[in-house]
């Protein structure tokens, strides 16, 4: 089995901080079994995430997967009140992860001084996507070591590395030629559509570029209520999530000039024994968010048409990927949209679906709540201006409980957790859904008019 990186994975690696991280969060309303959590951690160390990236010996070559030299220990944090859990999760998301030098992931637990505990698992997107991460967690929870036979880092003599990487580049030449033809055609098409005028570049930000703290929220719903609401609106779980995402985007102004919302829906393409880190492609649809609260049939139809088109027509973005190893790093930074959906003003709506129950058992027993969040801890003001903001919505169903997590930032419209929670509460009310917001899970929101005590 080849250890050469897939071109999508090489793209994420070259995007560096814009690639982002995934964070899986568990909450226990009782103490965590530390011994069980240590076993979980040990199996992760011998699972599908036990690898790192070694750069090619050629400046334009394909990188390779190698075995890690060492791995970080389980972190047991100093106890804090549960109300500080969100702040701690943000600190965990900010831990420096490095797919090349390690660590590529980190597991930690926070005991609550007022009872219970939380667990955080963060992993760089360079190592896995959501489905791959879910598989790694399930395998570790079940005590399964998914050992990948990889060479040690630095094990190839330089002459051998140069020879092997040159041969790989030679094998890639036909794809590079096709990509050059496609890139030229795309450039001609852009000139025809936009004429000689070009969009003005964003004004540079004065002084040093600054990091942006992205608002995040998570809420939980009963799976039967979620499914019933989707069915009553003529949709599915996928289209209900897309409808929620579209309405939230509408509320914060993340829309096109005609008021439409551009949704990017990840499609899982992972196969058995797939070694790719990111085995997904994006399906793009444009929807009118206005009728979503009463009728999801148009979103459902648009999704179906897009999936058919995806199977029949090659994705232009995939065709261009063979050029990635050849592109200078200064130009790679302009491709930040690849990691967040592929277009400006896009909204990513990702539904993993029904996850195996074992994903909720990091210490060997069921947690009370589990959720997956996207994080971009190193996103800067320049990047957010380039993207026009950011919105990523995730969902899955675990043991008849649906979680929805949101990471969103809209310059001038949505810049804080409080603002995001207010928008989420109103959107849930629009859909007549009752949800439990946040990790304490004590006060339901939605399902009534704003200000109603039943919210």
Go through the PLM ranges and name each one.
Residues 15-21, 113, 275-278, 397-400:
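Short, flexible turn/loop "capping" segments at secondary-structure junctions
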Residues 21, 388-390:
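Short beta-strand-initiation
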Residues 408-410:
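Short beta-strand segments enriched in hydrophobic/aromatic residues
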Residues 282-285, 392-397:
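Short beta-strand elements
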Residues 445-455:
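Long, low-complexity, intrinsically disordered segments
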Residues 1-31:
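Short, Lys/Arg-rich amphipathic segments at extreme N-termini
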